[in-house]
UniProtKB/Swiss-Prot annotation:
Primary enzyme class: transferase
Residues making up the signal peptide according to the UniProt record: 1-24
Statement: the UniProt record of this protein carries the keyword Amino-acid biosynthesis: no
Residues annotated as domain GH16: 25-234
One GO cellular component term noted in the UniProt record for this chain: apoplast
Protein's name according to its UniProt entry: Probable xyloglucan endotransglucosylase/hydrolase protein 32
Gene that produces this protein: XTH32
Amino acid sequence: MGNSLISLLSIFHLLVLWGSSVNAYWPPSPGYWPSSKVGSLNFYKGFRNLWGPQHQRMDQNALTIWLDRTSGSGFKSVKPFRSGYFGANIKLQPGYTAGVITSLYLSNNEAHPGFHDEVDIEFLGTTFGKPYTLQTNVYIRGSGDGKIIGREMKFRLWFDPTKDFHHYAILWSPREIIFLVDDIPIRRYPKKSASTFPLRPMWLYGSIWDASSWATEDGKYKADYKYQPFTAKYTNFKALGCTAYSSARCYPLSASPYRSGGLTRQQHQAMRWVQTHSMVYNYCKDYKRDHSLTPECWR
């Protein structure tokens, strides 16, 4: 009886320790869920194929796109927006995906070639046994064209993005850009000047493509097409905001309960946890960079 009781207490102690360990590696609740304020959008009503139509398949309202040796694929929103909430549930492919980029992003590249704005969520493919890297980026007025001035922040997620769908979103307002994962803010990019913030209308895009020259460990590992096709699945599309044609009275959704924007204290705590435990690169802390080109880092 005594030994049995000791064994049970030992098991209970281990479970408590295990639970504490799990919670230690999971962000605290943000306390507010902006995705719940936006209804899902039928893919055919909100988007169109951009390229690689033969590498795109719909099953009800779940979209699969894939990359093989012949082509990748991409889609684009029908409407351009000047602000709004943009998201989707995405599930990534496990295994060897080095060199492959899966993305959800805002851009006006087709409207302003060589001088465009862009706000990115990109999943950088990986090798066996290593996690994906989620890269967020902001380009302003051609900083992604020719002379690259990226504003990258990279994260290793606290879950396996190949096991299930998770919701990834960009909330873009005239004051700030907030990147969210399952409604947890992971990055806030405030407007500090017109020269460092995208203000022109953009479209929402998604794509899968070969970026072997840089995607995985700066191009060390390339796409290997013996593992093709490389797939990505999207569902629960959300795109709600002020279009390029909306009146000046149109007001974008906020990431928090505050109509004026910003984040609550609880959301800040969740974001701080992510940036402490999951962020692996911050362009503002890269001292090899010329930060005269990124003045928002020192203002």
